[in-house]
From Swiss-Prot:
This is Polyribonucleotide nucleotidyltransferase. It comes from the Bacteria. Residues 630-704 form the S1 motif domain. The lineage of its organism: Bacteria, Pseudomonadati, Thermodesulfobacteriota, Desulfovibrionia, Desulfovibrionales. One of its GO terms (biological process) is RNA processing. Belongs to the polyribonucleotide nucleotidyltransferase family. It catalyses: RNA(n+1) + phosphate = RNA(n) + a ribonucleoside 5'-diphosphate. One of its GO terms (molecular function) is polyribonucleotide nucleotidyltransferase activity. Residues 702-743 are annotated as: Disordered. The keyword Cell cycle does not apply. Mg(2+) binds at D494, D500. SMART domains: KH (SM00322), S1 (SM00316). One of its GO terms (cellular component) is cytosol. The gene is pnp.
Amino acid sequence: MSQDIFTPTRVTCQVGGKEIIIESGRMANQAHGEVWIQCGGTVVLVTVCSQPLEFDKGFFPLTVEYSEKMYAAGRIPGSFFRREIGRPSERETLVARLIDRPIRPLFPKGLNEDVQVLASVISADQENESDVLALTGASAALMLSPLPFEGPVAGGRIARVGGQFVLNPTFEQQAQSDLNIVFAASGDALTMVEGDARFISEDVIIEALEWGRLQILPLVEIQHKLRELCGKPKMNFTPHQDDEALVACVHELALANGMEEALRVPEKMARKDARKAVKDKVMETLKADPAWAENEAALKAVSDILGGLEKKLVRARIVNEGTRIDGRDTTTVRPIQIQTGLLPRAHGSALFRRGETKSLVVATLGSSTDEQRMDSLTGDVTKRFMLHYNFPPFSVGEVKPVRVSRREIGHGALAEKSLRPVLPADADFPFTLRVVAETMESNGSSSMAAVCGGSLSLMDAGVPVSAPVAGVAMGLIKEGEKFIVLTDILGDEDALGDMDFKIAGTAEGVTGVQMDIKITGLTTEIMRTAMQQAREGRLHILEEMAKAIASPRKELSRYAPQHAEVFVNPDIIRLIIGPGGKNIKAITAATGASVDIEDSGRVSIFAPTAEALEKAREMVSYYDQRPDLGKNYNAKVRKIMEIGAIVEVLPNVEALVHVSQLDVNRVEQPGDVARLGEDMLVKVIEINGDRIRASRKAVLLEEQGHPWNPEDTARPQRSDRGDRGDRRGDRGGRDRRDRGDRR
């Protein structure tokens, strides 16, 4: 009999002053693992399902998906079909990676199961973040499932507000914070770190992570408790063991055919060829040996056995000799070469090379209309700075489908958050910025090359960044109690090592950090050593960057958009826009400029050239002019009255042309001279605050050779018109006092 949905199994704990609830049995009971995790009004449903693989894919097929349901925040999707369709958003992809990275290493090697973890945000209270809940929920669901999982882990977010650490801050607290780090930890060690900071010292980050790890221990404990209450029996899994005789034979053949020498070749592609040559010789020998020739499983296992030997040899050399694959010691950064301004039509460009890793990074400036607009649980969001990281297959000499991968989105996000703290405020530099990092070749740390190249390209474009930013990737080799931290790791060192720790920042402090750890027991001592060594490497890279370009260029590229701001009276905004946007469209058509108007009257103009900018500014300012005393205007008659005519001398600026000023001769009826809707050339003869008087008579006198004298057009007295008699009699008017009973 199925469990009553109203009585799920529940565990709770207090974390960061908030209650977190994890329960199972309410929702997806046919999933192999399922939890509902809640904090405040934010709820995430996480499910786990698995099925045996029909054949060995050569890798562990773990799929993690995170989705934000718009109904969770009481919103309807903005897509044409009004439903969540298409590929995941950038945020959904990044959160899925946050979940994947700490749980993937906790599955045993050789697990022949297709595993899918789905996390869905089904309620969002606009206060409590869902990403860290999803991470913890994924671990809890895996703990309940039959899958072998060496967890649990828990996730948390650390902010620093007013000098005090805050765990799982609200959105408002995050906006006030100078630190924003998401992390995952088991009971005694960190397993994943991702975050950004505003020039925070290494010591503060270490302190924050250690503090945060201790704060989330209750989340680890209640997962064990939930497992005891309702966990499914774990499947029997026996890790694959290679034939000892085969392992010994492969090792002997590899060493005899130059494996150690191949691993000392400093160039990546040459080393790859040398290793392949060793493998080919080993396979050739085994296929000629009757003991192994017909054993397909043994021949298939050779690649993994050789990989294990390579890892053992490289790690032993680093530990025993302090020498790395390319001959460097443990703290040396690879040689750096930089070229800026190499693309003639780009707004800013830089080619950054560090060893065999090279990135072409290009900065583009746009207008406010180029901002990225996104539909999210918190409402419509705009993004003024974007960094896109591309990793084409040719960068590593491979043939693969060309599409944007999750890895590329993740690396771009890390580089973006590392550069964002040095960007000028919107009010000081209102351009939209897009930086694209094209990886030309890669041998490790390409994301950090994107950070360095991004900083250089922004300075080349003339963006007034507050300081240059550099990044470096750190590695770790840990054997027993002995550990060695590696600066500026190669791709092979990333694969063979125990940690990938990327740190970016300025000379003042850290701006971005990302860490993935493959082992348990990452001590504070290791963290401190890695952070200090990374700082030394970062400062060295910043010195090399300063040799190419030390500060932002004083002027923008002549191909960049030109910008100006105009402040107008808010009352005339509707005039500038025009009916149906007619006037704005006319400005754009005439100049190619984009015009953005705020309710405050601030008008931001972006144009392709300086000439177009000036023309657009004049066209906007035309609607906000004030008339000059004594100046002639081709006015339009808007209203005819007994005392004269109301004319529009400028947009939204009206003046009275008194009947005595309509002509050089006496005018009995204003309509005899003024025609509604027609143009009339007039001179402004008086400005008294918002009251303006104009004269057609003064213009006519000037045409007859009589210059205008302000005294000639002084405000008329009633006697100026002479004796007009009884107006009721002469004009046929009626005495308003004798109108009879109008009821």
